[in-house]
């Protein structure tokens, strides 16, 4: 029995056994080799649309901020209290500064977006050309250069197009699209493209069993039928390079261009490296600088460097101080003026847009509330209308004060001086002359002193212009400090004309501030 069994086993060993399919010269490129490149094309095709969306977002934010600034300016002109006016002024200044920051970088951001789109399309063009050529040489199910089978697999499943493949497998080989892409492109990492995984390029082991494909052969029966070609062929921008030696690898890795820029795996795919360098600048909205401050949200407004600076300069009145050094005071003042929660903030400020009435004369539209006006032109017209109205009111007050001031000025005449019959009462601008023959005119007007005093009164300058007392009034008691020459203020008797000039100066200053905003 043992002898018979031995004979049977020996015979079985002699029988032919089926062999697995093997990669061969003339095989089609396996799907697991070309699929990373196909995924990259889909990623790259999104970049122009993402760039366009990010630029549109920046432009829309600038327009939105411009409207908010105009609304804040109108509310400032119509503010019912000083605290409210200061708050609106700080908001308007902060929003204007934010607009300035965005606009100053707009050209740079536009150039970065264009560069990203151009570089991505250039790289995608290399890949798209590869897919078009490789698929075009198919002639039958078992004859062609691309297959949906993996490397080392059986011949067959050769393709001449990609429409029948799943969405995740289809290479993007069509025209450039700028259709907006709203989300960040996660396949663009900080170091490279996650799609472009490490590869050995095209070699015999990358192929399937023979499908009559000459394009990827590495020997003398390849593209050059008389001899091996002289150097590597950089298919698809070098990512799928074919070495002239049949099974020699041509390594490439597009997932990391940063850690080792001189790595040999990067040397042959510089077109993808350049594409990543440009695309990385629009990798996320934050990277591109398209994360914006929403000044209607208290938590964001409080963090705005522009609002904090405005609060420091305008509300605290400390323009020379540092925002960092005054951080505690700024936080306290923000809470006092704007509120400590979103509801209070909106109640004090942005909800007022629904209550502020804008008449037709201001906007050119039928009377409505400020929040209902969407036209920037109408908003700008209303701001000009109310600003002009405020400035006119200030000018009217200044004119009134000038008239009052001129009427109140005391002009001493020679006859006034003649009334003083003793030297101790003959004070400036009068002058005592002991040698005059006319005893009724020993005290007479000194023209020089009279001119000096009149000039001081007119300009609000001279002794007492800053609110100090003058010789005429300084020694008088409260009961003797009477108009038109003097006026009691605080604990001293002061020149009334100087007080009027001081008030006039304050009004001029107020008008100047109004013109600035």
UniProtKB/Swiss-Prot annotation:
Protein name: Variant surface glycoprotein MVAT5
Protein topology in the membrane: Lipid-anchor; GPI-anchor
Composition bias, Basic and acidic residues: 471-487
Residue spans of biased composition, Low complexity class: 454-470
One GO CC term, this protein: plasma membrane
Signal peptide range: 1-21
InterPro entries: Trypano_VSG_A_N_dom, Variant_surf_glycoprt_trypan_C, VSG_C_dom_sf
UniProt keyword annotation of Calcium present: no
């Amino acid at each position: 029995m043992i002898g018979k069994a031995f004979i049977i086993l020996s015979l079985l060993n002699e029988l032919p056994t089926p062999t697995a399919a093997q990669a061969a010269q003339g095989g089609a490129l396996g799907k697991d080799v070309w699929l990373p490149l196909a995924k990259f094309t889909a990623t790259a095709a999104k970049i122009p649309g993402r760039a366009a969306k990010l630029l549109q977002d920046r432009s829309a934010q600038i327009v939105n901020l411009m409207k908010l600034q105009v609304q804040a300016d109108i509310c400032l002109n119509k503010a019912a209290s000083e605290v409210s006016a200061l708050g609106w002024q700080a908001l308007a200044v902060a929003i204007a500064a934010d607009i300035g920051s965005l606009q100053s970088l707009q050209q740079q951001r536009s150039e970065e977006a264009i560069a990203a789109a151009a570089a991505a399309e250039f790289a995608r063009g290399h890949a798209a050309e590869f897919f078009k050529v490789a698929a075009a040489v198919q002639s039958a199910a078992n004859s062609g250069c691309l297959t949906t089978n993996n490397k080392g697999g059986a011949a067959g499943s050769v393709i001449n197009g990609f429409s029948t493949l799943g969405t995740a497998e289809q290479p993007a080989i069509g025209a450039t699209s700028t259709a907006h892409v709203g989300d960040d492109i996660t396949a663009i990492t900080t170091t490279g493209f996650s799609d472009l995984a490490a590869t050995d390029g095209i070699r015999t082991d990358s192929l399937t069993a023979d499908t009559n494909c000459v394009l990827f052969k590495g020997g003398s029966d390849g593209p050059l039928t008389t001899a091996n070609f002289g150097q590597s062929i950089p298919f698809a921008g070098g990512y799928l390079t074919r070495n002239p030696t049949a099974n020699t690898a041509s390594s490439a890795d597009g997932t990391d261009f940063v850690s080792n820029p001189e790595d040999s795996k990067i040397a042959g795919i510089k077109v993808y490296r350049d594409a990543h360098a440009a695309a990385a600048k629009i990798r996320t909205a934050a990277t591109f600088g398209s994360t914006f401050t929403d000044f209607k949200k208290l938590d964001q407004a409080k963090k705005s460097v522009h609002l904090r600076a405005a609060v420091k300069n305008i509300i605290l009145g400390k323009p020379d101080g540092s925002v960092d050094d005054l951080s505690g005071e700024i936080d306290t003042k923000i809470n006092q003026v704007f509120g400590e929660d979103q509801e209070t903030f909106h109640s004090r400020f942005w909800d007022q847009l629904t209550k502020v009435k804008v008449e037709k004369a201001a906007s050119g539209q039928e009377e409505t509330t400020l929040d209902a006006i969407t036209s920037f032109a109408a908003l700008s017209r209303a701001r000009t209308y109310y600003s002009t109205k405020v400035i006119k009111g200030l000018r009217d007050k200044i004119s009134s004060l000038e008239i009052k001031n001129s009427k109140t000025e005391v002009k001493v005449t020679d006859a006034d001086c003649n009334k003083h019959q003793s030297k101790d009462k003959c004070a400036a601008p009068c002058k005592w002359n002991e040698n005059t023959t006319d005893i009724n005119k020993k005290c007479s007007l000194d023209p020089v002193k009279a001119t000096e005093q009149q000039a001081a009164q007119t300009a609000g300058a001279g002794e007492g212009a800053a609110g100090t007392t003058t010789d005429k009034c300084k020694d008088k008691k409260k009961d003797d400090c009477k108009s038109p020459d003097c006026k009691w203020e605080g604990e001293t008797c002061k020149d009334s004309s100087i007080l009027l000039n001081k008030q006039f100066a304050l009004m001029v200053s107020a008008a100047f501030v109004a013109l600035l905003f």
